[in-house]
Amino acid sequence: MTKAAQMAQTTAKGSVHLLWGLILSTVISAVGTIFIAKLLGDENYGLYTIAVNAPVLFATFRDWGINTAITRYVAQYNSQNQLEKIKSTILSGLIFELTLGIILTIISFTLSGFLANLFGRPLITPLIQISSIVILTGALISTATAAFTGLEKMHLNSIMLIVQAAVKTGLIIALVLLGFGTAGAVWGYITAALIAGLTGILLTYTMYKSLPKTPNSKLEILSTTKIMLKYGAPISVGAILYGFLGQFYSYLMNIYVTGQTGDAAIGNYSVALNFVVLITFFATPVLTMMLPAFSKLDAQKDQQTLKNVFQYSVKYASLIVVPVTAIVMTLAQPAIITIFQTDYSQAPLFLALLSISYLFTAFGSLSVSNLINGQGYTKFNIKVAILTAVIGFPLSFILISNYGVVGLIITSIVVSLPGLFISLIFIKKQFSVSVEWLSSAKILFSSAVASVLTYLLILLLALPAPLELAIGVVVFVFVFTIMSVLTRTLNKADITNVRDIVNALGPLRKPLNIIIDIVEKLVELVH
């Protein structure tokens, strides 16, 4: 087995461990979201959404790229068996995150009135004061996640996610039913985040203590922090620019999307965002696990492996994420109606538009930044962020002022493309690596055909929404599979690679191999 195939196995195993955590936590959260949205109504749900997101402006300054640095260096040191450096990296990152988390939480609490006025809703000042704690809890959760990812212990991350989802759902529903309204929802959200953060740190500690002790070694907190800041600061500068851009979007929304109609639109937007997790189920594990994978490789010594790993990541991620995205876009309306009936009537349109950016997986959007950061070229992030900001500020003003939430979504789609394209040019020049464009085109074409046929069939049948949803999923999967075989998107080499990857997935190996056998027979018929 090649080195690329071995890395693919490890990455797939970590992705599956993260996937089950995402699925369970999201199902729990989705059930909670349905009840919470119904209990609060679209206006109060919109206020709840604003309150818990308001401190993001200050949270942007907490990380300074430290969490990305933790993942990168822990993965690198683990592959080099430098265990003491792993300990120094995790502990240094935690100290840095906690220190800034506490400081920024206090600042956010103090300036909560300013934030409330900035969002055009001064009455939610107490809610923003409560939600300011999310900055500190975010430090705990993100540090634990970075450590789990670097050591590829994603089952621990899944435990943390499930704890957060279960506590959040139970607490918010209970507090709202007890009559605490929007304030109860915010308290439930923050309490769950705190419990999840403490759980994550406890699991990180057990993982930390399990690392073998190295004789005559000591922790080097200050020097390690300097190394991580040198690596992570450019990422943070980019993140801060993105943060200001996001807050500018929010500011425009508060000016042009106002009143009861505006709050309802924000509520619809929030519901649509919750449905997008159907796509992130599959996109997030790939996005998360590729940074440690690329961090283990040396572009000079492992050039061919680097190329293979990148192309595998793009192609196989696209084979999953692109069709799932197409399903969500095609069946957005019956999906929303099935759960909310006639409520949240704008959500299907918002959901379909929000899904578009995940189609860029076929262009390498989930892998390219991880390749660049994994190889240490973090300063490139600043160039991408500046380009995005230069386009985003004027474009958002034009689109949001005229089209509200739709303008916001279109802006977020458009501004991401230039950065993606210059990133692809960079990796081509720097590493001689590129996307396998023909495969990506075939995947997009197969998904488009399946979407069109599924949509037309549902339009003709005009059945109740739950039946349309069920039939639509079955028809789409069938058509996409046939089209993938006919267009030769999958070949025998791909089948072999996928089978090797699947064989590392334990209990999932047998059912997945049955599916692979069926696809293999279809491929043999065409070839």
Role assignments for model-derived ranges:
Residues 64-79, 150, 209-213, 272-321, ...:
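Helix-loop junctions and terminal segments of transmembrane helices
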Residues 10-72, 101, 105-109, 129, ...:
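Signature of the first transmembrane helix
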Residues 14-29, 164, 188-196, 200, ...:
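Transmembrane helical elements of multi-pass membrane transporters/channels
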Residues 112-131, 260-263, 328-360:
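Interfacial segments at transmembrane-helix termini and the short loops linking adjacent helices
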